[in-house]
Design a protein with these regions (language model features):
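Conserved S-adenosyl-L-methionine
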Residues: 65-207
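Short acidic-aromatic active-site loops that bind/stabilize oxyanions
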Residues: 37, 59-63, 172-173
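Class I SAM-dependent transferase core
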Residues: 43-68, 74-76
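Long recognition/docking surfaces used for binding and targeting
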Residues: 1-53
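Short hydrophobic/aromatic-rich motifs at helix boundaries and adjacent loops
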Residues: 19, 41-46, 57, 69, ...
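Short capping loops/turns at secondary-structure boundaries
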Residues: 17-20, 40, 62-66, 88-92
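Generic secondary-structure boundary/loop-capping signal
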Residues: 33, 60-61, 200
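Preference for short coil/turn "hinge" residues that link or interrupt alpha-helices
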Residues: 29-32, 56-57, 72, 196
């Protein structure tokens, strides 16, 4: 994990997990019945936020904005795809995550509408009159189009719509290095967008 996120400076080389063997075994026994690899980013993110709330709440006078308040403000702001979103005092990244998810949902809805439109075009009455071989060819072409659309939702594809949202539109800073790292990890757990989060006092007068 340290090597994978080395460029993001999430962990120091000296960081170690300090846990007793008995505690580790108890955690494994409790969690081994769940397949987290098949769990959605939303579920992982909610679980991580629950952990954050219990661990950091009130630490150094910092409190987290309730998710209902975040959702309300994001809905009022109504961020659009391609717009730059910045939180100069991002804390655990709640507002950045809310904005990321809001725009991501719009992208997903748009792509789903595009899929329906394309499928309707390919599955018209004309399709029913094709020979079996011609239908197979049409199905193959349809699958290629859908596969290309799916790359738009890959956050690692920097040229895709979700990739551009993750790498070009989401930015945040926090004066507390621990909170900056926490915001990065929180965004990773919610499906990414962490690359624009940095340790910096965003409220300083740089002029």
């Amino acid at each position: 994990t340290k090597d994978y996120y080395k460029d993001d400076e999430l962990f120091d080389d000296s960081d170690k997990i300090k846990i007793k063997q008995a505690s580790f075994e108890a955690i494994v026994e409790e969690l081994e019945k769940y397949n987290l690899s098949d769990t959605s980013d939303d579920v992982k993110g909610i679980a991580f936020e629950e952990f954050l709330g219990r661990t950091f709440r009130g630490d150094l006078g910092q409190f987290f904005t309730p998710r209902t308040v975040v959702d309300f403000i994001i809905k009022v702001l109504d961020p659009q795809e391609g717009e730059t979103i910045c939180d100069p005092a991002c804390g655990s990244g709640g507002f950045l995550i809310g904005a990321f998810e809001y725009v991501r949902n719009k992208i997903e809805e748009d792509l789903q509408a595009e899929r329906v439109k394309i499928r309707k075009k390919y599955k018209s009455e004309y399709y029913e009159n094709l020979s079996k071989k011609e239908q197979e060819k049409a199905d193959e072409e349809l699958n290629k189009i859908f596969s290309k659309l799916n790359t738009e939702l890959d956050s690692k594809n920097k040229n895709g719509r979700l990739g551009k949202l993750s790498f070009d539109c989401i930015f945040g800073t926090d004066a507390n290095p621990r909170m900056a790292r926490t915001a990065k990890m929180n965004m990773i757990m919610h499906g990414d967008g962490h690359g624009g989060v940095h340790h910096h006092d965003g409220l300083l007068n740089v002029n």
